[in-house]
Amino acid sequence: QDLVVSSWKERLIAERMHQKAAHIQQLLQQTNRHWEEVFWQLTARNFGLPQNSEVFEAVAKTISVTLLAKHKHQIHQLEALLLGQAGLLEQQFTDEYAVMLQKEYRYLKKKYQLHTIHGTLKFLRMRPSNFPTLRLAQLAMLVHQSSHLFSKVLEAGSVSQIKKMLNVTANDFWHTHYTLTEASPYRAKNLGTSMVNNLLINTIIPLLFEYAAEHGEQRVQQKAIEWLRQLPKENNRITRLWEESHTVHNNAHDSQALLYLKKNYCDAKRCLQCAVGNAILKRT
């Protein structure tokens, strides 16, 4: 049975990568196959987490990597661009930092003839560490501290190299703020291990896998899968259900396979098309 489960997990991961590839290919088409641009848009989407992913991706689509590169050395300008395009610099502010960002944004908006995104960002029922204001500030810092990120991902020899690149800390203002309007007790706002792992699992590894598939680079594909095995298993409601049923999962490769299995086979009642389901039915 372990052999059945093990080989089925490989198949599920392949299906999961194929599912992710559909969105990647759509973005490649929109960007004239610009991999760095797609990497930027998907990274921004991931920073938005499920609640704000659509708005974050829409914001990224209005700010090209070329425009980001022009302002990458000025963290305040990057924050102004991202927060402004997300519609978070529209109100009256009293805090001088927020006023400065608003002024910066108005200048950049006029200069580049930008159009603010009018999606609604969610703050309710979210941990302050996931507030869109803070996540956009961290995203700005990632742009500020790195360049040609996707090229660096392709060149990276280990998953720890990528983790080092990703683990940024937001600008000083954010150490005492989660939003632009309210101060909070001091806490350094670094991206954190779970968010870094989330980015690797949901954006970097699928994009790397798809790039390798398109360019016939099997070694890079294997590297992507190996990185998935090196990441810790995810901890959420569904993975805990699998644990309760004594299904072994040791790393992110396993948990991703099981998450995909639950959504696309168990929930869809496709037991007869599932290797595990078949094995169980044969025993009964």
Language-model features: where?
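Long, contiguous, compositionally biased segments that the model treats as domain-scale units
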Residues: 1-7
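Hydrophobic, aromatic-lined core segments that form the binding pocket/scaffold
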Residues: 12-255
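Acidic, carboxylate-rich catalytic segments that either coordinate divalent cations
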Residues: 244-284
